[in-house]
Amino acid sequence: NSSYVTISHNRKYLYSITDFGVESYRILEDGSLSVINHASINGMRGCYLSTDYEDKFLFVAGYHDAKLTVLRVRENGEIGEITDEIYHKGLGSIAERNFKPHINCVKMTRDNRFLCAADLGMDHVVVYELNHMNGRLRQVDIIRSEQESAPRHLKFSKDGKLLYVVHELKNYIDVYTYSVDKEHRMPIFEKIQSISTLNDYHAGGSAASALNISEDFKYLC
């Protein structure tokens, strides 16, 4: 059974999480799909996947095992070998999540340099530098959120200069500026705003789950 799906940036291929790992499809002219291949992620079922902006690598977030998997993508859309596997470790702050790390979203910066991984169990976003030659990741930063806020989903602005992070349990969005230190080639994230996703008259029982931006890039949903 498929769950989360994503489309390559060249709009030619669709990738899906399945029971056995990930699967790739060719998008035909009539909109139908043709299976290309499938690949194991060597772990528990993923919850989110995305590609880099050159469509050379596929990233899979693991909620259940806190595993981040990187797989190579070939020019014909076929999923290749695993190039890196990283397990988030540590003691989380949320009792109902068993005090464990849970990776829920992975997304590249728009300049295609860094991969951001939202861990709602650890209340932070881990930032990795991607080696475009071998598909390996190197941790370079951590964006820390409020305790028990559960950062769940990420979105970058059209120009790539702003990062939006929605927090599931406390129902608010943090806004960060993004830039790169040219001397040290390191990412810089600075928080400029926190805004609630709830109205003043909200009665409770809400949990923020995802972010999207309107086609005109004027509204965050």
Model-identified regions with their sequence ranges:
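A short beta-strand motif characteristic of beta-propeller blades
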Residues: 1, 34-40, 90-96, 138-144, ...
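Blade-loop segments of beta-propeller domains
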Residues: 1-55
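Residue-level detector of Asp-centered blade-edge/turn motifs that repeat once per structural unit
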Residues: 7-11, 53-55, 110-111, 158-160, ...
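Short loop/turn segments immediately following the C-termini of beta-strands
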Residues: 19, 63, 73, 120-121, ...
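Short loop/turn segments immediately following beta-strands, especially the blade-tip
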Residues: 25-32, 71-80, 129-136, 176-188
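Asp-box/WD-like beta-propeller blade repeats and closely related beta-sheet repeat scaffolds
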Residues: 35-105
